[in-house]
A protein has these predicted regions:
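Terminal intrinsically disordered/low-complexity segments used for targeting and assembly
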Residues: 2-81, 230-274
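Small/polar, glycine/serine/threonine/aspartate-rich low-complexity segments that form flexible
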Residues: 57-68, 109-137, 141-144, 254-268
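Periplasmic alpha-helical coiled-coil/stalk elements that build and connect Gram-negative outer-membrane
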Residues: 154, 158-274
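Long hydrophobic segments that form regular secondary structure
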Residues: 288-291
Length: 294
């Protein structure tokens, strides 16, 4: 059952009724996306933007990064701008914002008018009928909508940080395997030279067939390892390519050697504590639990 408030106006305050009608029919939009992307840029140190595929300036930036020797930061920046999965997640933020704004809207009041005549006089009355229960629940709906938006916001942040971590892991894995590939190529060359030398020594009668077989087996073993590593590098290149948002092969190249380990790496327990405090998915769950408690 709905409760309604009924306001009666005479000719003198008809203007007031019109103002009330206008005020109830519109809700100002909130520019939350710009605030969100600026906040996320500070946290991640990467440019965050949606619909980058429709922004020529951002596409030029991506092409410029691809033309240079690809660093881990460049790969992450491309992924944040170009990954279609992340772009879809950004749309969830827009939906949550729309739900939040919708929660603040009141049903449009009903305008009633009547003309009374009697005793030679004509009397005009204007009335506005408003859903009173909806009016009372509006603050609660707005608060709930904001809390749900904050939960979605934390989940979106979690997706951004997860993508950054995934791209960084893929980049360093590829970089390490490419470095191993270079090493295996040198080993294969050395093993092939040793095999050819052993063949000449065997032909001259200086070594046994068993020694020759050992050299041949060693060559084929390292050759197989090289082929397997080449396949693995191609797979990892494709994985990183897709994480950066590309569906077809791109002619990018990464740096060849892994960075040196820092001597000032934080201890594991400190990393675990920091991760627990800052994980965005946990922050989203905390917001949802708080809403349920209230």
């Amino acid at each position: 059952m709905k409760l309604f408030t009924h306001y009666i106006f005479n000719k003198k305050n008809t203007v007031l009724a019109s103002m009330l009608l206008i005020g109830c029919s519109t809700v100002p939009r909130l520019g939350v996306w710009n605030d969100f992307k600026d906040e996320l840029a500070l946290k991640t140190q990467y440019l965050v933007e949606k619909d980058a595929d429709k922004n020529q300036a951002l596409q030029d930036t991506i092409n410029f990064l691809l033309a240079e020797e690809l660093t881990v930061d460049a790969a992450i920046q491309i992924a944040v701008l170009n990954n279609p999965g992340l772009q879809a997640v950004f749309e969830e933020l827009g939906i949550a914002q729309a739900d939040w704004l919708q929660a603040g809207l009141l049903t449009n009041p009903k305008l009633k008018a009547q003309v009374l005549s009697g005793g030679g006089e004509v009397k005009t009355e204007l009335g506005i009928e408003q859903d009173f229960m909806g009016f009372l629940l509006r603050p609660l709906r707005v608060k709930l909508g904001e809390a749900q938006y904050q939960a979605v916001k934390h989940r979106v942040e979690h997706e951004v940080f997860s993508l950054i971590a995934d791209v960084r892991e893929s980049y360093y894995t590829l970089q390490g395997d490419k470095q191993l590939l270079t090493l295996l190529q040198s080993v294969v060359e050395a093993s092939e030279a040793a095999k050819e030398l052993a063949q000449r020594q065997y032909n001259a009668g200086n070594i046994s067939v068993l020694d020759l077989s050992r050299h041949q087996a060693n060559y084929h073993e390292v050759k197989l390892a090289l082929i397997q590593n080449e396949i693995q590098v191609e797979i990892e290149q494709d994985v990183l390519n897709r994480k950066m948002g590309f569906t077809s092969a791109q002619s990018w190249k990464i740096k060849g050697t892994l960075p040196q380990f820092s001597e000032d790496e934080p201890v594991l327990l400190e990393l675990v504590s920091r991760a627990t405090e800052n994980r965005m998915d946990l922050q989203a769950l905390k917001v949802e639990i708080k809403v349920l408690e209230e």
